[in-house]
């Protein structure tokens, strides 16, 4: 059966010498794995059109099991995103988080809308690192945990100016007066905790102009990766590349 569906490539894996297996998140929010034969060959016409983040109309044959890709009518290749290693790495973290948050046959129109929102904001100039923070925040519950950033987990105080760390022992932000109860708490600014809470609660439809300074953004990213590792046992492949790029940048200074 010939199928035509709009979607975004969220995963691409080499298969043999010349083929790829791609996964698209289609417009209905379903993950569709497709065999892209000869996609690694330049002459096939599929090499450029089977990269991560390509948004297009995918035409494929589907009977039983995995479909076979015939062609892609590209709507947006997000070519500039693919040229920037840092930006593409954080965008890959977004795609990987969304992919791994969904079961094989699960349908999530929200995740499709979230990914479209992420890519459109990156195109407008919003840092991909910030978009990865939003995706990680919005998908916590899919990995079986939540995190609270708006009050002290020990004293209950709701004055966010007093919050200075996140405690894995008490599963939440903690205030300066309670810090002595967890010597291993992860220290970060109250501004970081405040903005994490805002981004966690705010619907993506209400997120317009997004601008967060780099040091706060770095604290957000570090904490969220720690949360996913501690509470869900998650290790992201794309984060490994991000860590390598950060080390290279530090070594070059």
Curated annotation (Swiss-Prot):
Zinc is among the record's keywords: no
Gene3D superfamilies: Nucleic acid-binding proteins, Recombination protein O, C-terminal domain
GO cellular component, one term: bacterial nucleoid
UniProt entry keywords in alphabetical sequence: DNA damage, DNA recombination, DNA repair
Source organism, top-level taxon: Bacteria
Transmembrane segments: none
Pfam families reported for this sequence: RecO_C, RecO_N
GO biological process: DNA recombination; double-strand break repair
Protein purpose: Involved in DNA repair and RecF pathway recombination.
Family named by the database record: Belongs to the RecO family.
Protein name: DNA repair protein RecO
Native organism: Staphylococcus epidermidis (strain ATCC 35984 / DSM 28319 / BCRC 17069 / CCUG 31568 / BM 3577 / RP62A)
Lineage: Bacteria, Bacillati, Bacillota, Bacilli, Bacillales
Encoding gene, per UniProt annotation: recO
């Amino acid at each position: 059966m010939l199928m035509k569906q709009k979607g975004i490539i969220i995963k691409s894996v080499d298969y043999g010498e010349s083929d790829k297996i791609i996964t698209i998140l289609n417009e209905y929010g379903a993950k569709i794995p497709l065999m892209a034969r000869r996609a690694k060959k330049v002459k096939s016409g599929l090499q450029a059109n089977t990269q991560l983040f390509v948004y297009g109309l995918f035409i494929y044959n589907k009977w039983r099991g995995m479909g076979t890709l015939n062609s892609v009518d590209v709507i947006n290749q997000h070519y500039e995103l693919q040229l920037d290693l840092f930006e593409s790495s954080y965008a890959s973290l977004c795609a990987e988080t969304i992919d791994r948050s969904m079961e094989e046959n699960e349908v999530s129109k929200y995740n499709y809308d979230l990914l479209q929102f992420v890519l459109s904001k990156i195109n407008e100039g919003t840092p991909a690192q910030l978009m990865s923070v939003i995706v990680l925040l919005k998908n916590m519950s899919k990995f079986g945990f939540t995190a609270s950033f708006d009050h002290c987990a020990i004293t209950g105080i709701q004055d966010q100016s007093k919050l200075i760390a996140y405690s894995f022992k008490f599963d939440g932000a903690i205030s300066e007066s309670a810090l002595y109860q967890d010597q291993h708490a992860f220290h970060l600014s109250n501004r970081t905790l405040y903005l994490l809470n805002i981004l966690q609660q705010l619907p993506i439809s209400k997120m317009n102009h997004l601008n967060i300074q780099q040091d706060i953004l770095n604290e957000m990213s570090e904490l969220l990766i720690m949360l996913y590792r501690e509470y869900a046992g998650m290790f992201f492949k794309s984060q490994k590349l991000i860590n390598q790029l950060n080390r290279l940048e530090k070594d070059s200074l």
